[in-house]
Amino acid sequence: MKKRKSCFIWLLCILLLVTVLPAVDFTDVQAASVSSTFTGWKTFGGKKYYYKNGKKLTDLHKIGKYYYCFAADGTMLTGWHRIHNRFRYFGKQTGRMRINQTVNGRKINSKGVWTPVVVLDPGHSAVVAGGYEPLGPGSSQLKEKDTSGTQGVATGVEEYKLNLSIGLQLRTLLQKRGFKVVMTRTNSKVALSCIDRAKVANKANADAYIRIHANGSDNSSISGALTICTTRNSPYISSMYRKNKALSEAVLNAYVAATGCRKEYVWETDSMTGNNWSKVPTTIIEMGYMSNPSEDRRMQQSSYQKKMVRGIANGIENYLIK
């Protein structure tokens, strides 16, 4: 009986140790065993590290003939990453930075930098393009070339002004992050049809075409953001569905995460002329409802606009390199 009781106590002690004591990170244990004079490669837990005089390297470094990059914990990076606001690719197996190559259709220059192109389209304008245009290539259905957009129910601010403000701020942030940015408009004095805007994106061969809008509804209680893309069975550009959907999801998720606004959904529809005529990855971001007094006021706050801009930028980047 005493023997059974003793075994039970030992078993209980072992269980307590397992549940109470912190898990041992054997990678850290192995790393701690590296000599203070060691310089070279080490692999722990399937991850590669480079040591110089016993210390893990972090950031971008030239080792021998090649450049490598290491995360803050020293892990060797692979794939696409934005390093010091420049987009670079590191081989999946070797971790070597690529130069003078094309990877996934993306041209990398002699300095190891790929510069993604983003076209920003601040929706609407003070001067509205009159008349009608085909809904999509080859379509007999016509739709207005543009509309005046909506207006803030509480602030009175026209949508085209908000769209342009966000677009210009977004351009600045994206350029700082290493993007090339093309704008469909930088003022509100020009009338542009939806096809005109799509042509700008097509000519630039954009890696992402972001159409910036704000929403409106007869129901003033509705709030939140949504994105819009073409459908899987689009009669105009079905080949772009996968990329359009992925871009729409990435932008919406990042925008909601940055702003904390209500998340609606990705609306798949072939009723948007600008989307139908675009030959590059495209989404419309409806940033919020100007028909909701609270959301309307919020979207005019500079602090909130910074969150809006950061969210869209993060979404574009997530789509391109993750």
PLM feature segments, named:
Residues V157-S165, A191-I195, S238-A246, M299-K307:
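Soluble non-cytosolic domains of exported or imported proteins
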